């Protein structure tokens, strides 16, 4: 009986702890840039890798550069482990796509799943483009507005960012018209008020951008929303397929253990019930015998 109780306790412990690996040796950490992923030339940026898993070490790796992997001892603060990588004096050589990994001391060669990629871009290298709004920077809620980024420089790609947003939109430059190269970013409906800037870049150096355009404030009158269209991010209605895959996989793994726990609990209760019935059996027989004896005595008195 004690072995069964111990087994039930162990299964319940794992279910409560949720100790199921998501992917890799440990689940992926998060990678952030402070103050942001767009860094002016010669300025400093801090890349922070953090996780609620207590990693002792973090590794920072830039894609395509094997000799630029940095290792840092993690700090444990308020239930979070983190490591800060400072990139001083930003140059073209340091721009690119970064990922970070976590590891623990007793398994230093087993890394966690990689963090989501983070693009670090150097800005301020080329002539700034111009940013304008059509029909104008002030529109009614529900109306369409188009932001046009243009320059006489032959940029291959234009990037539009909104102040306070982590991601940006990008479009290839259209054919040269009136000695300018232009990309038009439609915002439809016009519920995306905020301050916008645009940048230009060349095809062979996607992480090296121009200077920022002058800021453009788009004002939306009426009922406005701060939603920002992102073709790369799914809406909350459709959900993230990757996240759903993790949830489904975790549920499939937990289901057999849940069934096992139910089976053990049912068997334990059945054994307990059977033991209780066996204990009550002799007492019941003695009661019946006493009743039979009393009934026989009563019959003898009556015949007498």
Curated annotation (Swiss-Prot):
Glycosylation sites per record: 67, 84, 178, 223
Ig-like C2-type domain mapped to chain residues: 42-107, 142-205
Membrane topology: Single-pass type I membrane protein
Family annotation (Pfam families): ig
Tissue: Expressed on a discrete subset of peripheral blood NK cells.
Residues in compartment: Cytoplasmic: 265-304
The name this protein goes by in its record: Killer cell immunoglobulin-like receptor 2DS5
Cysteine pairs bridged by disulfides in the record: 49-100, 149-198
Ranges of biased composition (kind: Basic and acidic residues): 288-304
TM stretches of this protein: 246-264
GO biological process: immune response; immune response-regulating signaling pathway
Keywords: Cell membrane, Disulfide bond, Glycoprotein, Immunoglobulin domain, Membrane, Receptor, Repeat, Signal, Transmembrane, Transmembrane helix
